[in-house]
């Protein structure tokens, strides 16, 4: 029994070293979410799968169409992180501001419900080589207006992004986004 408890503690500690989600700050008009994760693959591979295979790892529950395979990221300045909808509709989630493959990807815009709030945000992915692969740092800084204050949205945004980045990690390492 004691060895099972020790094993459970070790698993939790190891998982904590892999995913470090944090609401870095929040206030009435905005928040910043930061996630740091180790991924066992080269930065170029992580970047490529993030950009070119977004529909394979993004959670379909966080799409307007209900199908993540309708998502795409155009790898160019002013490129679109877009989603196709039925009946020739579309959603422009974010715009590519800056990319250096295997090093950084920065998008501008508002995800999901933040679009209707007139919010503006920057979502930055930084890829740093480390001995066992890549340290991926994700920062989402958002400003906007909500009657209850934007701080109340920080934890849900953190949860959604942590889910997405965990799915990316799983996809890169195993070929499957969900474990």
Task: Mark where each language-model region is.
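Positively charged n-region of N-terminal signal peptides that target proteins for export
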Residues: 1-5
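Bacterial N-terminal signal peptides
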Residues: 7-17
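Hydrophobic/aromatic beta-strand elements that line small-molecule binding cavities or substrate pockets
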Residues: 35-37, 92-98, 121-129
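Hydrophobic pocket/interface hotspot
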Residues: 46-50, 81, 96, 107, ...
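Beta-strand/loop substructures that line and gate deep hydrophobic ligand-binding cavities in soluble
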Residues: 112-162
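Short, highly charged C-terminal tails/helix-capping segments
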Residues: 170-179
